[in-house]
């Protein structure tokens, strides 16, 4: 490690000890190295003993800076790995840091766009509208259309900082996994690797721009979700230009109520938007925390969600969607046997899983949940309990399902914050049942034919020629198979002949040796010559 890395590592350990995070390392499971290191830093004491562990962890990550803040935010979504007293405080982490100089931001943008901003924009505000750990946002107007826009720019020199801290994270994860057998269950190395991929993806604004364009296209003309327009001509790896929006933050309940918003409809539309993204589009916004969701102030009786920051999205394939929908329906019908079978059929758990034991484990965990009224049941926590139970049966982490679970918890939390009586199951069940009918019912056949009609219309004129070519190739294939079979039979005959000749030759050579011992020299010589001759004939048969 370089001196700079050692200095940073010492600072990280010092902050962790000042917040008493060594409580996370139980003494009876530690190897000698971590114990020795802790004792060697005896002068660093817990400065916040009155605060609970989860809050101390949150404050420590906040102090360590943006890379660790985002890591904590990701940890808060992994409720399959971390208990509520750890995950809940981490969900409160705020990704807010001091802005960097606006003139420097302008220089970064001009470098990325290849010219002065005045060529394309007017009224550029040197004061940032918002600032986060990865990027900063400024406002301006498009010169050609006078439309208000926001320019998002990646912080300069952020990449070396991220690379350095990620390298330390990987080292620390390997140390923790090696020092504590119990920690291996949390898969620290895999968690850091997953975080690294997510964080590095956020450094490329082309990805976010493409995601926003796709999501906007999916909801074009919708009354439920609005995604601001992105201007790809002015967007690249480090700069993204998009439409400026004015809205009420979804967590501003007083502001929404003062605007006369239909809170029940707004909450139900949040659920509808989620299930539409997942089951209709297989492409969903996976970072829908309150900071990224606004509500249009116009037409409060017919409220519309606004989705920002599409840096993290999730996708599901058709098989995952079908299994997920069937799981939800089976769960709320309390058909735990079907839930267990679906997990095996989907490959989420090993094929040799004992279905009876798996069913019983699911029943024990989930039956108490359904003792409550349906309107009080958390859809997200049902999914969380299911995944936690499945992990005991060696279910591998499914990244797409982790993102789905996180998003569902966000949407459900927002929905019940807006309208506490929200019955998510009542809202979602008709959607799921209709989707299942469209997938496996008569309508599915109609949809399949409709989707494939252009392909068959294009191929229909070619069918006679394709049929003729197929018959012709089939005949040629039969002829080749006959020739191969004849060659195979000939080869087997030659091998049999070779084995026979070799056996005769071996017998004659043995006889020659016996005759020499009994003083029949002439017969011995004749027998030996004959044996060698048969061996040569055998070798020739094999060669052919």
From Swiss-Prot:
Q: Which PANTHER family match?
A: CHAPERONE-ACTIVITY OF BC1 COMPLEX CABC1 -RELATED, PROTEIN ACTIVITY OF BC1 COMPLEX KINASE 7, CHLOROPLASTIC
Query: What is the protein name given in its UniProt record?
Result: Probable protein kinase UbiB
User: Which UniProt keyword terms apply here?
Assistant: ATP-binding, Cell inner membrane, Cell membrane, Kinase, Membrane, Nucleotide-binding, Transferase, Transmembrane, Transmembrane helix, Ubiquinone biosynthesis
Q: Name one GO cellular component term.
A: plasma membrane
Q: What topology in the membrane does the UniProt record assign?
A: Multi-pass membrane protein
Species source reads Vibrio parahaemolyticus serotype O3:K6 (strain RIMD 2210633)
The metabolic or biological pathway listed in the UniProt record of this protein is:
Cofactor biosynthesis; ubiquinone biosynthesis [regulation]
The UniProt record lists the EC number as 2.7.-.-
Q: What class of enzyme is it?
A: transferase
All copies of the Protein kinase domain together span 123-501
Q: Which residues cross the membrane?
A: 496-516, 519-539
The main location is: membrane
């Amino acid at each position: 490690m370089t001196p700079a890395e050692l200095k940073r590592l010492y600072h990280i350990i010092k902050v962790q000890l000042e917040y008493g995070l060594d409580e996370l390392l139980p003494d009876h499971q530690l190897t000698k190295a971590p114990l020795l290191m802790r004792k060697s830093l005896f002068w660093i004491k817990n400065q916040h003993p009155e605060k609970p562990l989860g809050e101390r962890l949150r404050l420590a990550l906040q102090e360590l800076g943006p890379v660790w803040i985002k890591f904590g935010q990701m940890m808060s979504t992994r409720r399959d790995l971390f208990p509520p007293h750890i995950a809940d405080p981490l969900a409160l982490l705020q990704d807010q840091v001091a802005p960097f100089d606006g003139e420097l931001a302008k220089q970064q943008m001009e470098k990325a766009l290849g010219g002065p901003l005045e060529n394309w924009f007017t009224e550029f505000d040197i004061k940032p509208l918002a600032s986060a750990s990865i990027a900063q946002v400024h406002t301006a107007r498009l010169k050609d259309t006078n439309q208000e826009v926001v320019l998002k720019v990646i912080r300069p020199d952020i990449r070396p900082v991220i690379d350095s801290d990620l390298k330390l994270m990987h080292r620390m994860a390997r140390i923790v996994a090696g020092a504590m057998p119990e920690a291996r269950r949390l898969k620290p190395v895999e968690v850091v690797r997953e975080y690294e991929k997510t964080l590095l993806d956020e450094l490329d604004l082309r990805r976010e721009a493409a995601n926003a364009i796709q999501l906007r296209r999916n909801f074009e003309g919708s009354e439920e979700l609005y995604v601001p327009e992105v201007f790809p001509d002015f967007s690249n790896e480090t700069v993204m230009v998009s439409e400026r929006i004015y809205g009420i933050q979804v967590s501003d309940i007083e502001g929404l109520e003062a605007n006369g918003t239909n809170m029940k409809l707004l909450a139900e539309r949040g659920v509808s938007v989620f299930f539409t993204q997942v089951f209709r589009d297989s492409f969903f916004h996976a970072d829908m925390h309150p900071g990224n969701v606004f509500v249009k102030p116009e037409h409060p009786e017919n409220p519309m969600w606004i989705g920002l920051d599409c840096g993290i999205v999730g996708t599901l394939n058709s098989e995952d969607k079908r299994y997920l929908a069937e799981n939800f329906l089976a769960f709320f019908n309390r058909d735990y046997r079907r839930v267990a079978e679906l997990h095996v059929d989907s490959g989420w758990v090993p094929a040799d899983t004992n279905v009876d034991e798996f069913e019983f484990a699911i029943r024990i965990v989930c039956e108490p949940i359904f003792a409550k009224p349906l309107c009080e049941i958390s859809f997200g926590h049902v999914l969380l309990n299911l995944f936690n139970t499945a992990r005991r049966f060696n279910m591998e982490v499914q990244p797409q399902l982790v993102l789905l679970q996180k998003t569902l918890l966000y949407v459900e939390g927002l929905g019940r914050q807006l309208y506490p009586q929200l019955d998510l199951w009542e809202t979602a069940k008709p959607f799921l049942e209709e989707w299942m009918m469209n997938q496996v019912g008569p309508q599915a056949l109609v949809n399949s034919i409709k989707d494939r009609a252009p392909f068959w219309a294009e191929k229909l004129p070619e069918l006679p020629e394709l049929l003729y070519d197929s018959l012709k190739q089939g005949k040629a294939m039969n002829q080749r198979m006959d020739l191969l079979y004849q060659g195979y039979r000939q080869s087997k005959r030659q091998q049999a002949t070779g084995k026979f000749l070799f056996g005769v030759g071996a017998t004659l050579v043995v006889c020659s040796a016996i005759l020499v011992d009994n003083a029949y020299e002439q017969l011995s010589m004749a027998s030996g010559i004959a044996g060698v001759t048969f061996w040569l004939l055998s070798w020739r048969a094999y060669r052919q």
